[in-house]
Amino acid sequence: MVRLREIPRTATFAWSPGAASPLIATGTRAGAVDVDFSNETCLELWDLGLDRQSTGEELQPIAKFDTDSGFNDLAWTPSEDNTRGIIAGALESGSLDLWDADKLINGSSDDAVISRTSKHSGAIKALQFNPRHSNLLATGGAKGELYISDLNNVANPYRLGTAARADDIECLDWNKKVAHILVTGSSAGFVTVWDVKTKKESLTLNNMGRKAVSAVAWDPEKPTKLVTATPLESDPMIYVWDLRNSHAPERVLKGHESGVLSLSWCSHDPDLLLSSGKDNRTLCWNPQTGHAYGEFPVVTNWTFQTRWNPHNPNFFATASFDGKIAVQTVQNTSTDTAQAIADQNQALDGEDFFAKAQTQPQVSSFSLPKAPKWLERPCGATFGFGGRVVSVNLVEKGQRASKIKITPFEVDEAVGQSTETFENALKEGDLRSICETRAANAATEEEKADWKVIQALISENPRKGLAEYLGFQDQSADEAADKLANLGLGKEETNGESPKESRGPGAKKHKRLQSMFDASPEADNFLSDLAASKGAKTNNPFHIFNGSETEADKGITRALLLGDFEKALDVSLKEDRLSDAFMIAICGGQKCIAKAQEHYFSKQTESPNYVRLLASIVGKNLWDVVYNADLSNWKEVMAALCTFAEEKEFADLCDALGDRLEEQIRASDDKSLRKDASFCFLAGSKLEKVVAIWIEELRENEQKALETAANDTSFSIHVRALQGLIEKVTIFRQVTKFQDTERTKESDWKLSNLYDKYIEYADVVATHGRLQVAQKYLDLVPEKHPEAEVARNRIKLATRQPTAQKTQQTTTGRGTPLNKPLPTTNAYQPQRTFSPVATAAAPSPYAPPAPTTNAYAPPAAATNPYAPPAAATNPYAPPAPASNPYAPPGAAAPPQPTNPYAPASGGSYAPTGYQPTPAPSYGAKPLGGSVPPPPRASNQSPATVTTYTTATNLPAWNDLPEGFAKAPTPRRGTPAGAAAPISSPFPNQSPSIAQGPPPPGAPPTQRTPSVPPPPKGTAPPPRVTSPPSAIPPGPTPPPNPYASLPQSPPQLNPGTMGVPAPIPRGPSPYNAPPSMPPPTNRYAPSPAAQAANPQLQARGPVPPPPQAAASPYAPQPPAASQYAPSTPPLQQGPPPASTSRPGTASSQKVTPAPATPKYPPGDRSHIPEDAMPIYEILSADMQRIKGRAPTSFKQQVEDADRRLNLLFDHLNNGDLLKPNTVSDMADLARAIQARDYEAARAIHVDILTNRTDECGQWMVGVKRLISMSKATP
């Protein structure tokens, strides 16, 4: 019941029609006195602004129109000719006024009045537009006048009924299903149903003695049902009528304490009815059942009108004479029940202690028992992972049965189609066609260039392809000669002589070549002369030494004669004879050539640039070109790399050149170089570098597309850009055979940005139903990537194939298992009943020998090697029942085989079978209220059991006590009303239920505490010695035969009269399987803590362990005789050793019975001096908290105080807490006193962790005290 808005007016009101933001029209209530005694009457329009957060400011009207009279009623209807509809006002003066709402809102008040008619001789009390024909308006008023007006002819309405009536029509309502039916209610008690079509009365209801009628309302769905209300203070009734029986009301709704003034039946849900009246209250009813759901916040004066919002029934408004119109919701956001649960579960940490309580308004609230009809969806749909939509539709309208349909769904079909096309092209392996298609359809030059470069990489010689892409292609010899001849040569430079005569085609020479080898005509015959035959003689003799040689000439000659080309080279280089040096080097081999080249390049400091390039090429040092060449010549550098770079250095050289281009981009902000850098990174297969550029281009292209897009959505634009990136990366990886070496790393990935895009793209294609494609790209992401791990799990769950599952074991009426998920016992083998003590029953000299094991019984199942150790036997459990000397043969059952599927004992949770207690005999007193009622049937199919390792709703150690939470409803194999087989000679005696091992997969049950709760009281033993009757079962459903026990049976006190063990049944093939032993509660308070709590000591007589379920075909046991011995001998075996904590001294000895406290609870006179600060500080702080805590936390504060008193009792008795713990608790108390809550928490955690045996319920109180004290200023 959240009050959304308040209109500060005493006025009648009407909601605006339509789905727009709701407006309310108000008209000053006739006869009402304002706070300032103003006589002003007006029509006002209010914008509630429910779409904006309330600022606490008082609402102001958006339109106002003064009138000459007050209003009794208002109505607002939609209209085709008027944008915001027409408002009709019923004035006290008898005038019917119509306004155009749109003109009122726009400020045209002078033109807003549509019409003003005065057909009524007195005040108009009520009016309403026809819900099916908005042009028809019914008005009723004084002297029984009832008019029907047509808005197309308002001046000429027609009247219904006779002209002479002394009563007034107080209310009216059009039928919601039959358009021409109208009902009116008068002050004389007449409820008349009119047929407007025939202009006659249809019938008149006997309104229970002609009591005045203040309100009427039709059922929104049933045309024959309506409700009426009486304004009498002595008899405030609401009558529900069915016109098929108009003599008496169908139902009477009683709840108002004074007269009812207004009714409003929700048009969206016929189960909701609002009523308001003179008792200042507004109630919500279910008129179909007569049940009152609850009441809304009470006001200070009469509530004379209440109305549902016609379009959004979540809101309604109520007008009262306290000068306010309250707009509120039908449901509260936080009910008292929810608040109580929240209070119990609140952690009480920090400022949350008060924050939550202070935000809850102290108002009445209630919660609807079922969802309103407009929230009951007849259909629904939800998006499922993997491009699926799950929809739910009714099989047939009006039925509750639904059908579920799963259909594929794609946000953008183009995305799915392009994904399929690309994946198919990849499977075919035609990468070149993909590149050509993408390059042809590229939106930008950069994208086109990328695809061209990738296409070049696909060629047989990628380097040659890259050089050709840059424009460096191989040339023929003639083309090279032509270009060389045209390098700036106009005339031959021949020292002023005319050019030599051409020597035929192909004789074009460079001027330098010509000057070097064209010195004399004899030079042409030089080579031919050298090639003379062996015997030929020439006429060109020469001297090796002619006497004019220099020393250098002589040295070179001698070296050549001796074949010492290296020495000859040294002399030539020393004399700077480079031409001779190169000729000698050619003869001397590669070593000499390298030496000559090195000397040559060292001398060419002022030589042309190509010499330095040649030096880098010859010296295989292209790094000089990469790092030092001007970036305007990056293409030439790249061509040189493609031509001369070694394979192992090529990628790094391209990477270095690309880095230089990126630095230039950052320095000059010239993004045109980005394409050049991308080329370098592509050529060098540097995926991490090129991906960064592509992602940046993706964002820019996406932004441009958003600015120019006409019909595309932002999602489609983004996905197309993302898909283009993924396609380029995928093709590039395949072409370059890229290997990601960082997939095993856990962080700091170089391709982190690409991994994010892979994950995003996988999510997109998965949304379009391509789960396999999504899985392929997720496999490219490192395994340790957190987001990829989540995405992989989703894909894995969505694509997993259903596996054959073992069906749950079910039992037929004869107890034969249909399936075998569990090891079964022999159907003809006697079953053993539950015994909390692991010792066997003592043999009886009168009992026959136990039957031998059936040779055909299945072998015992092996013990589960992975199960935890069995729970320690409860030291307070009764011993095994003694063998009955009168038991029939076969009563003693052999040991049952171990169930490998049963949950291991010793955990905090182990389900056991339901174990009812047999009715006491021999005059034993009846059981307390804590004993569960007997079951109604014993042939229920076993429920599945979830082991403690897989259960998800296991209770925690500090949860609510057992019994506070509702147990889950058990599943039944048979109806609840099925009769149980008779297992007792007395018809009213409680039957017992067989105890069997729970099958796997059953719902989790509650834990069995090791110490049972105290009995609710003891009663004297009954005097009747006849067989007692069973405890009558309550209205609760039959208990689950596999639910856990609410408590473990305590041990009988020595000296107390025992209850004889029930007679065991003989072997039967229909007995249920044996039960599991109950586990001990490792979270129960220690024995010392139990000793300090007097509530845990008193125990009433305890029933014996339950017996196996009786078979309807087994022989009936003999009736308990009153002459039987009152106390058969009890035999008890030695107590078993505890196994709950192996290896510790405390767990290997039997815990003694709790000792009686030395001093009564509440006594504080014996607290030692070293512990006195604990008591003084903690109790004082607790009193401070009590005085400042909000009332909503009263329960938590009292619980903390009670637990602290347990601590003080231990301190007073000097038990449980050891001296070092007392010292630590004193330090904790001083820390709380000093407001050092972190230190207090640290001490608390240390005690709780390392000294568990000294902790009890008081530790929870200390923890809560720390939290409360910190939250309390």
UniProtKB/Swiss-Prot annotation:
Q: What is its main location?
A: membrane
| Composition bias, Basic and acidic residues | 490-503
Q: Where is the composition biased (Pro residues)?
A: 881-900, 1010-1052, 1061-1080, 1126-1137
Q: Where does this one sit in the cell? A: Cytoplasmic vesicle, COPII-coated vesicle membrane; Endoplasmic reticulum membrane
Q: What does the record give under GO molecular function?
A: structural molecule activity
Alphabetical GO CC annotations of the entry are: COPII vesicle coat; endoplasmic reticulum exit site; endoplasmic reticulum membrane
InterPro entries per UniProt:
SEC31-like, SRA1/Sec31, WD40/YVTN_repeat-like_dom_sf, WD40_repeat_dom_sf, WD40_rpt
Provide the protein name: Protein transport protein sec31
Mind listing the UniProt keywords for this protein, alphabetically?
Answer: Cytoplasmic vesicle, Endoplasmic reticulum, ER-Golgi transport, Membrane, Protein transport, Repeat, Transport, WD repeat
Q: How does it assemble?
A: The COPII coat is composed of at least 5 proteins: the sec23/24 complex, the sec13/31 complex, and the protein sar1. sec13 and sec31 make a 2:2 tetramer that forms the edge element of the COPII outer coat. The tetramer self-assembles in multiple copies to form the complete polyhedral cage. Interacts (via WD 8) with sec13.
Question: Looking at the keywords, is Repeat present?
Answer: yes
Which residues are the signal sequence here? none
What is this protein's function per UniProt?
Answer: Component of the coat protein complex II (COPII) which promotes the formation of transport vesicles from the endoplasmic reticulum (ER). The coat has two main functions, the physical deformation of the endoplasmic reticulum membrane into vesicles and the selection of cargo molecules.
Which Pfam families does UniProt cross-reference here?
SRA1 (PF07304), WD40 (PF00400)
Q: Where is the composition biased (Polar residues)?
A: 1140-1150
Biological process (GO) annotations? COPII-coated vesicle cargo loading; endoplasmic reticulum organization; protein transport
State the family named in the UniProt similarity comment for this chain. Belongs to the WD repeat SEC31 family.
Say which species the protein is native to. Aspergillus oryzae (strain ATCC 42149 / RIB 40)
Keyword match Calcium:
no
Topology within the bilayer: Peripheral membrane protein
Where are the compositionally biased (Low complexity) regions? 798-817, 943-952, 967-981, 1084-1098, 1108-1125
Instruction: Spans of WD repeats, please give.
Output: 5-47, 66-109, 119-159, 164-204, 208-251, 255-295, 298-338, 382-407
Region: Disordered, residue numbers? 488-509, 796-829, 881-1168
| Gene of this entry | sec31
